[in-house]
């Protein structure tokens, strides 16, 4: 028994000396540090809710999609999703006036009163308010474009009226008392007075065609004789041998005359 007690005491002393020499492992210290989670701090974002009647919103559509009212900031829509418990979706917008601006807003219809829009603003703009000169310039440009478009339409209407009146009114100096109604010639209405010379010529030709032909033939023969005299006036008389040609020409002329006189009673008999 005495020996067993001495052995146990020696073992206890060795254990104590080992614990004093060997330090604690570093892994146990790291585990103790990792096991303690550090709480993350969430930054508090101030939100501001504004309700606007849909009747006052410009650009509202009847199909259900509603655009938010203009608040002098430039916004760009980057998403939309349905809301649980509401038949209306929610639109997400971010500020596009300046690159990197954290300002955001959410637009949706109110569940209680669907005739109103609920606009929730989050974060503040990190850039100055857009100058009013830019807004006035854009407004001025739009107004100038509208004015020029209206002026062009008015000019076109005036030109159309002028063309219509010019087509309807006859030219000055024409006597159209004998005309009953206009005729459609070449796709547009024109009075007979413009072609009065043609109308008169047709009437005169139908009534006295024989007189007209006689006058033209006489003028033609007289002109031909004058030209022959002017051309052959310097030539002398032909010799006696040329009488043969003269007799031949006289004979042919007599034959033509006989044929003409013989054709007249033949035409009368056919009638």
UniProtKB/Swiss-Prot annotation:
The subcellular localization recorded is:
Nucleus
What cellular component GO annotations does this protein have? nucleus
Q: What are the entry keywords?
A: DNA-binding, Nucleus, Transcription, Transcription regulation
Predominant location category: nucleus
DNA binding happens at which residues?
Answer: 64-130
Going by the entry's taxonomy, the superkingdom of the source organism is recorded as Eukaryota
Q: Which GO terms describe its molecular function?
A: DNA-binding transcription factor activity; transcription cis-regulatory region binding
Q: Is Transcription among the key words of this record? A: yes
State a single Pfam family of this protein. WRKY
Q: Where is the composition biased (Acidic residues)?
A: 9-18
Does the record's keyword annotation contain DNA-binding? yes
Name the Gene3D superfamilies for this protein: WRKY domain
Region (Disordered): which ranges?
1-47, 130-166
Supply the InterPro entries for this chain.
WRKY_dom, WRKY_dom_sf, WRKY_plant
Q: Cross-referenced SMART domains, in alphabetical order?
A: WRKY (SM00774)
What family is this? Belongs to the WRKY group II-e family.
Please give the function described in this protein's UniProt entry.
Transcription factor. Interacts specifically with the W box (5'-(T)TGAC[CT]-3'), a frequently occurring elicitor-responsive cis-acting element.
> What name does this protein carry?
Probable WRKY transcription factor 69
Annotated organism of origin:
Arabidopsis thaliana
Gene coding for it? WRKY69
């Amino acid at each position: 028994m005495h020996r067993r007690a001495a052995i146990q005491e020696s073992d206890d002393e060795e254990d104590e000396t080992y614990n004093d020499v060997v330090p604690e492992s570093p892994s146990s210290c790291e585990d103790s540090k990792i096991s303690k989670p550090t709480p993350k701090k969430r930054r508090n974002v101030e939100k501001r809710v504004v309700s606007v009647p849909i009747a006052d919103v410009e650009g509202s559509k009847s199909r259900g999609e509603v655009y938010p009212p203009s608040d002098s900031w430039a916004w760009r829509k980057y998403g939309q999703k349905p809301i649980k418990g509401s038949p209306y979706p929610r639109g997400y917008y971010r500020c596009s006036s300046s690159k990197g601006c954290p300002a955001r807003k959410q637009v949706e219809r109110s569940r209680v009163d669907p005739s109103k829009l609920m606009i929730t603003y989050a974060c503040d703009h990190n850039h100055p308010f857009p100058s009013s000169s830019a807004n006035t310039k854009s407004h001025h440009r739009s107004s100038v474009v509208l004015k020029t478009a209206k002026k062009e339409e008015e000019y076109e209407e005036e030109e159309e009226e002028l063309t219509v009146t010019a087509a309807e009114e006859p030219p000055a100096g024409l006597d159209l008392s004998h005309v009953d109604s206009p005729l459609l010639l070449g796709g547009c209405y024109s009075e007979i007075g413009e072609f009065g010379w043609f109308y008169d010529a047709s009437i005169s030709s139908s009534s006295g065609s024989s007189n007209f032909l006689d006058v033209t033939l006489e003028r033609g023969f007289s002109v031909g004789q004058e030209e022959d005299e002017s051309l052959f006036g310097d030539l002398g008389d032909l010799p006696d041998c040329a009488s043969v040609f003269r007799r031949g020409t006289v004979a042919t002329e007599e034959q033509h005359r006989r044929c003409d006189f013989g054709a007249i009673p033949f035409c009368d008999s056919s009638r």
